Amino acid sequence: MDKKYSIGLDIGTNSVGWAVITDEYKVPSKKFKVLGNTDRHSIKKNLIGALLFDSGETAEATRLKRTARRRYTRRKNRICYLQEIFSNEMAKVDDSFFHRLEESFLVEEDKKHERHPIFGNIVDEVAYHEKYPTIYHLRKKLVDSTDKADLRLIYLALAHMIKFRGHFLIEGDLNPDNSDVDKLFIQLVQTYNQLFEENPINASGVDAKAILSARLSKSRRLENLIAQLPGEKKNGLFGNLIALSLGLTPNFKSNFDLAEDAKLQLSKDTYDDDLDNLLAQIGDQYADLFLAAKNLSDAILLSDILRVNTEITKAPLSASMIKRYDEHHQDLTLLKALVRQQLPEKYKEIFFDQSKNGYAGYIDGGASQEEFYKFIKPILEKMDGTEELLVKLNREDLLRKQRTFDNGSIPHQIHLGELHAILRRQEDFYPFLKDNREKIEKILTFRIPYYVGPLARGNSRFAWMTRKSEETITPWNFEEVVDKGASAQSFIERMTNFDKNLPNEKVLPKHSLLYEYFTVYNELTKVKYVTEGMRKPAFLSGEQKKAIVDLLFKTNRKVTVKQLKEDYFKKIECFDSVEISGVEDRFNASLGTYHDLLKIIKDKDFLDNEENEDILEDIVLTLTLFEDREMIEERLKTYAHLFDDKVMKQLKRRRYTGWGRLSRKLINGIRDKQSGKTILDFLKSDGFANRNFMQLIHDDSLTFKEDIQKAQVSGQGDSLHEHIANLAGSPAIKKGILQTVKVVDELVKVMGRHKPENIVIEMARENQTTQKGQKNSRERMKRIEEGIKELGSQILKEHPVENTQLQNEKLYLYYLQNGRDMYVDQELDINRLSDYDVDHIVPQSFLKDDSIDNKVLTRSDKNRGKSDNVPSEEVVKKMKNYWRQLLNAKLITQRKFDNLTKAERGGLSELDKAGFIKRQLVETRQITKHVAQILDSRMNTKYDENDKLIREVKVITLKSKLVSDFRKDFQFYKVREINNYHHAHDAYLNAVVGTALIKKYPKLESEFVYGDYKVYDVRKMIAKSEQEIGKATAKYFFYSNIMNFFKTEITLANGEIRKRPLIETNGETGEIVWDKGRDFATVRKVLSMPQVNIVKKTEVQTGGFSKESILPKRNSDKLIARKKDWDPKKYGGFDSPTVAYSVLVVAKVEKGKSKKLKSVKELLGITIMERSSFEKNPIDFLEAKGYKEVKKDLIIKLPKYSLFELENGRKRMLASAGELQKGNELALPSKYVNFLYLASHYEKLKGSPEDNEQKQLFVEQHKHYLDEIIEQISEFSKRVILADANLDKVLSAYNKHRDKPIREQAENIIHLFTLTNLGAPAAFKYFDTTIDRKRYTSTKEVLDATLIHQSITGLYETRIDLSQLGGD
C-alpha cells in the first residue's frame, strides 16, 4: 500500500472515529491475518471505524474521600492527644475508662470490659443520663460550677469540644462577653455623644437588639434603626458607624470633608490599615468611636449564634443548646397533648410510624427537618391552640434537634472559651490540668497550614511537606519538626500551572508587573491614530508607546480613549483633532499592581528601576500564593532592609488572586536569533510592523515559533503518557488524546509504516467576533444591564460594577439574581459575598456541570438544609414567581428555570441522569488542539540544513461546522441513535472535506494546517464587504462560502443563481479536486458500507471496593465487613463489590455428598479487593475458592467489554462474571438514515421553500420505508438481540400507531434503536408503550463461544475457540 493516503479523525471524550482515504476519497480495504485456534485465518476489512471507551473521570470524588479520611484521622488524633494527657491521672481514678469508651460501639458480646461506658455500672450511668440529658448540660455545669468534678466527666466535656471544635473562618479573638447588643449599642451612643455634645443622639426607647439582630438584610436593619433616631440619616456619621457595625462598607469621605474616598469594611484584611489612614487625617480622638463600632459588630455577629445572656453563664453555646432542648421538650409535650385531644387517630402515625415524615420519622427515621415541617404544618393548621407552634415553624425554630446544619456557623473561639473556663475551674483540684492547659487549648486551636499540606511520610504523590526531623508531628512540636519555608516553596511549585507554549515554564501571576506591562503594550501595539495631513491611520511608534505608558498608564488605573486624545495627543503631540482606532472607549489592560505598590511603597523611582524587577515579581508571587499572614511575613522578611515597618505591614495585608497564561521566559526571556529582541521588546518597538503577541509567535521570519515548537516536541513511548498528563485539560480530554495517538500509530503501521499526507481532525469551536472581544465580560455586563432594566431594579445604581469585575462568579450571580437569595426570599449583602455559597442546582453527585446555568448564590445556612436533589418543592412554591421574573428578564435561561422548578415534576428522573452523562461531551472542544500539536510533533521530526522543520505530514484542524454543513447541503444526514457508525462517518467526512479544501485552496494551508501560519489575508478570499470586519467574523463568512466548490449551483445574496462546473480543479495546477458525478457517489457508497470496525475498549475496573451505603445487619454472607473483625451479621456492611475483571477457570470441583471431583469451565469475578491476592498467586487463590487441579495455562483474564462471537455472527460483550451486553451493530442503509432524519425534522427543516418542499415530498413518497426499517430491526433483533417478548410488544405498538403522522412515527422509530444498540440493554418508550430492558444475566453461553481479542482499531484480531479448551 504505497499510495498516498490521508487519515480522518473525529475525537470525543467517549470515542475516536477514524478513516483512511485515498486521493479519490475512497476507503481502501485490506486482508488481515487472524491469529488463534479457529478455522478463520484471514479477514477482509474496510479501513474505517471507531473506538468507543468509558470517558476518563476527574479525581474529584477520590479527593473528597481522601480529605474526609484525613479529617477523621486528625479528629481521632486530637482525641488521642487528650487521652495521652489524661492517661496517668485517669488510671488512678478508673483504669478501664478509656477502654470502655473505645468499646462503646461494639455489641455486648464483643466487649471485653463492662458494658456501661462512663461509670462501669448501671446505677451511676442512669443517674448521669438523668442529670445530663445532653453533653451541653454537662458542659454548662462544668463551666459555671466551682465544685470539684469527676475527672471522667471533665474528659467527656473536653473531648466533645475538641472533637467538634467549630469553624476557623473568623480570625483572632472573639469575645462572647461582647454579645450584649443593647449594652454595646448604648456604649457606641455614649462615645458618640461625648465627641458631639452639641448634637447628641437620643436613643432612649430604641430596642437595638431586636432591630440589629433581626433576620433581615443589613441595609434594611440599618434603615429600621435610623428610622428610630429623629434627625439622623443613614449616610450621616452615626448611620455610617452602624453600617460599619453591620458589616456594610460605608464611605466616611463626606462625614469628615475629605478629598478622597474613605471606605471601611470590618471584614477586610486591610481594615486596620484603612482605619489608621483615616485616623491620620481626622485625628486619634475618633479611635474610641471606631472601637465601639467594632465591639458592636462582634456582638451582632455572635447574637445570631448565641441566644442566652452571658452574664448568667460563661457557657453561652451550651446554654443556647440547653434552651433549644428545653423548648423542644415543652413544644413536644404541647403538640402531643393537642394531637391526643383533637386528632387522636393521627397520634400513632405522627409519633410512632418511622416510615412517615412525622415526629418518629424525624427523630429516628430519615426525615429531614424540612420534610418534617412539611408533614406537620397542615396538621397544626387544622388544630386550635397551635398559633405559637406555627410561628416557630415559620421561623424554622420548632422542635429543633441538637445537631443541625447551622451548627457549622459556630466559631471555634466559642468552644475554646468554654474549654478554657472548665480548665480554669478544675485546675485547682487537678494540678495536671494547670500544667497542660496550653497543650490542651493548642489541641483545639491548632490547624496545619494549607501550604504545608498532608503530613504523609514516604513518596505520597499528594504530599509535598519537608521535615526538619523524623519525630512524630504533634500540635506542640510542629514548628520544630516541619520546615515551613521549604514546604511553602514546594507548594508554590505544585500550585503554579505551566505555560502551554513553553510546557516546562511556570506561568506568571495575573497581577505580575511584567505581565501587566505585557498586556498594556500588546493592546497599544494595535492602536492606530489619524489626524489632519495624514493620508491613512498610523500605528504608534516605540517612543509614543513609552510616553503613553509613562504619562497615562502610570498615573491612571484605567486609561480611556478620551484621556489618550486630550492628555497625550493634544497636550504632548499638539494635535487638535485625532481619530483613534483599535480600542473602544477604554483600554482593557492596566497597570493596577503598579498603582497598588506605588500607594504602599510611595517610591516611583524604585518601581521604575528595572534592577528591582525580580524583587517586585517575587513580592507579587508571594501575595498571590499565600493567604497565611505568618508565611507572607516570613517570605517578605528578605526585603525588610529595603522598606520600613509601615510599608512591610501594608504589603503583608495586600492580597492578589489569579494566574496569567504566559511565562516570564516567553514574554521576556527567549530572544529572536537575528535581532536579539524578546517578545516584550518587539511589543514596545517593532518599526512599521507593529505585530501583536499572536503574530510574533507565529511569524516565520522570527525564531520564536521555532523555539516554541521545539519546546513542545513530545517523545515516543512512555514520555507520551507523561506529555499528555502535563497538558491543561480534564481527564476526559487526556484519555481521548491518548487513544487518538494510539489509533494513528496503528493505522500508520497498517499502511506499511509510511506516513499519511494529511491527518484531518475535527476541531469543534464556536465562531467568535473579534470586535466583541474574546472575553465574555462585556456580554455579561450587557446581559445584566438589559435584565436589571427589564426588572425595574435600582441595584446597578446602588452598587455600580465594571464589566471586568464580572469575571468573579459570585459577583456575576449576585447581579443575575438581582441581589437576592435564590432559595429564600431575602436580600443578599454585596459586602459578604465570600460568606455565601455557590450552590449547584443539579447536584454535582449527578452532574459535574459548572456552568452559570447550573449555579445559584445562596446563604450558606439555607443551602446546607437543602436535599441532595434539585431545590425542594417547598422552595419552588415560595420562589417560582421570582424565578419567572428573572426568566422574563433573561437573567436566567429556560434550562436553568426548568431545573430550578424540577421538583414540581418529581425531581430528577433516571432519564435526566442519563442525559447528564451525554452532556459532558462538551469537553471535546479543547481536545483537538492538543491532539494536533502532539500528532504534528510525532509525525514531523526532520529538519532541513537551515534547521527549519520539514512538514512531511499536514495536520489539518477543521471546525465541526464545515462537516455539519456538508452533511446538510448534500443530504448525508446523521441520526446518532441508530448505531456508532456516525463517529466513523464523521471521521471519513472530515478527511474528505479537509483534503478537498487543501487541494482547492493550497494557499489557505495556514488556516487549516497546524503549525502553518503564513501571512495571507483571508479577507481577500471571501465575498468582499464594504465595511471592515474583524478577523474571527471574517472567518465565519469565509467558511460559509468556502464550501461552494462542492455545489453544482450557488445562490447569491441578490437571488441570482450561478452554475459551477461539474469537475472542480485547482486554479494554478489544473489538478482535479472534486468530480461531482464521481466523488459524491463514492461518499454515498462509503456511508452505506455495512462493515465498519467498531471496537469497545476493554478495561480493568478500578475505584471503590463496593457501593458506599452501609446496609443494616442481617444474616447474609454477601455483606462486606465495614472494618476488620466487625462481623456484618452484627454491625451491617457493604454490598455489591466492584469486579476488577473476570477470569476463565478450567478446573475440577467437588460435587455431591461423595465429593466426587468433576471438571468445570466457568467465569469467576475477581473483585478489586481480591485482585492483588489473585495476581500474587492465582492457583492458591482459586484453590481457596474450592477449585482443584486448576489448569494454570488455561486461565484467561477477561476485562469488562471482552467480546465473544456465537452462532450466526451474534456477539456479546462481558459486563461482569454474571452478565453480558449486546455486541453487534445494526448497519442501516443510508437511504433509511436520510429518510428518518428528514421525517423526524419534518417541521424544522432549514432551507429555501422549494428545497424543503422537495424534501417533504421525498418523505411522503417513501412512507413505505417505515415498514422496511421495522423489518430490518425485527430481523436483526431475532438474529442477535433475542428479546422476543420485547419485539412482539414493539411490532404490536407499531401496527397500532400506523396511522399517526409520519414525523411522530419517525421520532418513535428512532427510540426503537435502543433495542438494537451495542452495549448495555436499556428500557425505552415507543409511543405509549414502555419496553423494559432485556438483561442477559447468564454468562454460560460464552464459555464455548469464540473469544475475540481486538487491536485498538479492530483491524488485527486473535480468535480463541473456548469450546476447544478444558476437555478431559
Curated annotation (Swiss-Prot):
Effect of residue 78 to A: Moderately decreased DNA cleavage
Catalytic residues identified in the record: 10, 840
Region of interest called RuvC-I, as start-end residue ranges on this chain: 1-62
Ranges for region PAM-interacting domain (PI): 1099-1368
Record's protein name: CRISPR-associated endonuclease Cas9/Csn1
UniProt binding sites for Mn(2+) 1: 10, 762, 766
Outcome recorded upon mutating residue 1132 to C: Probably inactivates protein
Known EC number: 3.1.-.-
Native species: Streptococcus pyogenes serotype M1
Lineage: Bacteria, Bacillati, Bacillota, Bacilli, Lactobacillales
Single Gene Ontology MF annotation: 3'-5' exonuclease activity
Stated consequence of mutating residue 15 to A: Decreased DNA cleavage
Record-level GO BP terms: defense response to virus; maintenance of CRISPR repeat elements
Amino-acid positions noted as binding Mn(2+) 3 in the UniProt annotation, renumbered to this chain: 1297, 1328
Region named ARM: 56-73
